[in-house]
From Swiss-Prot:
Residues 321-665 are annotated as: Tail. Residues 41-75 are annotated as: Coil 1A. Changing D433A: Abolishes cleavage by CASP2. A lipid is attached at G434 (N-myristoyl glycine). Proteolytically cleaved during lens cell fiber differentiation with increased fragmentation as fiber cell age increases. It is found in: Cell membrane; Cytoplasm; Cytoplasm, Cytoskeleton; Cytoplasm, Cell cortex. This is Filensin.
């Protein structure tokens, strides 16, 4: 989130001429000429007072002329010294060189990223080929496993069949043995019958028939027994063949398993190696992409800084040109007792410039993931005003405050929140130290101011009454005051322009009570609070009286030291300017009485010169303060630079000022 606060202060100091005081002090002459002898002494005294007043006025003019002559000599000597533009130019040149180096580094990283992408593609293609080969091997292994399972099932089936056949063979053997025993028993019985029976022709013929039948049966039984033996031998041969086939299949399956196990282990090792290489390549690619993103962010930040430096140089160049060329003489309000220390002033200026140019770079580190807001608003008041002994100075102050708030939030991806900070090889990257540069410019400014500043003189307490008007502006727009010109500022946030005008108080006027102005709305919205008759609020100058704040009486050195302490403590600095409050705190609307008593800006600008004495000398002090806040997360690094505070004083007569106001309107 970037915040820029521009505080423009304008002061007017008016001085009455001594002739008015003398005319006011001059007594009226009596009308009667007969009293000439009595009033001659009074006339002589009045003439003596007038002569003394003219002599005193001549002395004051002579002192003022001497002070202006010393200021002119001081500015001529300052013109010979080297200004802060050289330091800024060198800083800009170094930043440009840094940008060129970063661009070369980015190109190198892009080439490395391209090579890494090409290597990743090659590894991916190899990995895909290996995956395809692995799939083919897996399919082949599955097919072989299926064939082995089928062979095992077929072997089991053959074993079962062989077992059944073995059972059948054993049953047939038992049956044939029983049949053989029965046949032998029959033969033995027949032989006994033949031996025991008497020979007879009938018995012999019958026995022969039975013997023939029995021999036939024995032959049939022997043929059956031979067939059973042949079947048994055939089954035994099949059994031996099946056992041999089973053994061969078991050996083939075992060798295939061993071979495929070795190949699968080898392929698994290759796949694991390729996976590790791919993971390493992905990590390298992720790191390269992270480096590229970091370089892109750093390049964008450096471009923004270069643009800001260009704008600062252009603005300060224009302001210094207008201050030193157009109206360089009445730049300081004090003209009494100007003392210049040339002995140590040059050394101090040289040392301040060396501090600016030799600002050491600081290490760029990632802060915590907590955005911090820091707003630095610095006010610098002039140390003293010109006080003449017989003259009574009436001060008329005009305060213009412009607060420009620019807020931008960056959203990143969720994965960038967990990314560790970038660690590069070699020494860490250095960035310009804007704080030291700003402190150096502040020191240079104080040295120059102390060199040409006149010593403080006791001031008589002056009564300060301010009147203020708020005008809210949004977008690319600006507010133009007839007496003060504000350049157009590209406003991405809300712009609040506060104009406070002082009126010259004469004797008998009553001091009004101070009131607080209405703060501008948030988020850059235009607060158009209209009256009952429909007139917008930005055309109604609201008169408010503001008491001088005690903080404004501090010197510029104390304020610079306070600002440095605030920058070191990194705490947001509260706004202490009179007539302005925190823009984030809403306030109840203004009463209708103040709105009814307001007048149009043109009428006010025309009526203001009539209040002060004619031919009054006016001084104008413009102070620009810019503070840029740092945004940081764990994945993005930015730079923090504080702005350069430059104060210029432009002196014009009231007639020239009125002409410039009419041109701006």
């Amino acid at each position: 989130m970037y915040r820029r606060s521009y505080v423009f202060q304008t002061r007017k100091e008016q001085y009455e001429h001594a002739d008015e005081a003398s005319r006011a002090a001059e007594p009226e002459r009596p009308a009667d000429e007969g009293w000439a002898g009595a009033t001659s002494l009074a006339a002589l005294q009045g003439l003596g007072e007038r002569v003394a007043a003219h002599v005193q006025r001549a002395r004051a003019l002579e002192q003022r002329h001497a002070g202006l002559r010393r200021q002119l000599d001081a500015f001529q000597r300052l013109g010979e010294l080297a200004g802060p533009e050289d330091a800024l130019a060198r800083q800009v040149e170094s930043n440009r060189q840094r940008v060129r180096d970063l661009e070369a580094e980015r190109a190198r990283l892009e080439r490395q990223g391209t090579e890494a992408q090409r290597a990743l593609d090659e590894f991916r293609s190899k990995y895909e080929n290996e995956c395809e080969c692995q799939l083919l091997l897996k399919e082949m292994l599955e097919r072989l496993n299926k064939e082995a399972d089928e062979a095992l099932l077929h072997n089991l089936r053959l074993q079962l069949e062989a077992q059944f056949l073995q059972d059948d063979i054993s049953a047939a053997k038992d049956r044939h043995k029983k049949n053989l025993l029965e046949v032998q028993t029959y033969i033995s019985i027949l032989q006994q019958i033949i031996h025991t029976t008497p020979p007879a022709s009938i018995v012999t013929s019958g026995m022969r028939e039975e013997k023939l039948l029995t021999e036939r049966e024995v032959a049939a039984l022997r043929s059956q027994l031979e067939e059973g033996r042949e079947v048994l031998s055939h089954l035994q041969a099949q059994r031996v063949e099946l056992q041999a086939q089973t053994t061969t299949l078991e050996q083939a399956i075992k060798s295939a398993h061993e071979c495929y196990d070795d190949e699968i282990q080898l392929y698994n090792e290759q796949i694991e190696t390729l996976r590790k290489e791919i993971e390493e390549t992905e990590r390298v690619l992720e790191k390269s992409s992270y480096d590229c993103r970091q370089l892109a962010v750093a390049q964008q930040t450096l471009k923004n800084e270069l643009d800001r430096y260009h704008r600062i140089i252009e603005i300060e160049g224009n302001r210094l040109t207008s201050a030193f060329i157009e109206t360089p003489i009445p730049l300081f309000t004090q003209s009494h007792g100007v003392s210049l220390s040339t002995g140590s002033g040059g050394k101090d200026l040289t040392r301040a410039l060396q501090d600016i140019t030799a600002a050491k770079p600081r290490q760029k580190a990632l802060p915590k993931n907590v955005p911090r807001r820091k707003e630095i608003i610095t006010k610098d008041k002039t140390n003293g005003a010109l006080e003449d002994a017989p003259l009574k100075g009436l001060e008329d102050t005009k305060l213009v405050q412009v607060v420009l708030k620019e807020e931008s939030e960056s959203k990143f991806e969720s994965e960038s929140k967990e990314v560790s900070p970038l660690t590069q090889e070699g020494a860490p990257e250095d960035v310009p130290d804007g704080g030291q540069i700003s402190k150096g410019f502040g020191k240079l400014y104080r040295k120059v101011k102390e060199k040409v500043r006149s010593p403080k003189e006791p001031e008589t307490p002056t009564e300060l009454y301010t009147k203020e008007r708020h005008v809210l502006v949004t977008g690319d727009a600006n507010y133009v005051d007839p007496r003060f010109y504000v350049s157009s500022i590209t406003a991405k946030g809300g712009v609040a322009v506060s104009v406070a005008e002082d009126s010259v108080l004469y004797d008998g006027q009553v001091e009004p009570s101070p009131e607080s102005p209405k703060p501008p709305l948030e988020n850059g919205q235009v607060g158009l609070q209209e009256k009952e008759d429909g007139q917008p609020i930005d055309q109604q100058p609201i008169d408010k009286e503001i008491e001088p704040d005690g903080a404004e009486l501090e010197g510029p050195e104390e304020k610079r030291e306070g600002e440095e302490r605030d920058e070191e403590s990194r705490r947001p600095c509260a706004m202490v300017t009179p007539g302005a409050e925190e823009p984030s705190i809403p306030e109840p609307p203004k009463p209708a009485a103040d709105q009814d008593g307001a007048e149009v800006l043109g009428t006010r600008s025309r009526s203001l010169p009539e209040k002060g004495p004619p031919k009054a000398l006016a001084y104008k002090t413009v102070e620009v303060v810019e503070s840029i806040e740092k945004i940081s997360t764990e994945s993005i690094q930015t730079y923090e630079e504080t702005a350069v505070i430059v104060e210029t004083m432009i002196g014009k007569t009231k007639s020239d000022k009125k002409k410039s106001g009419e041109k701006s309107s």
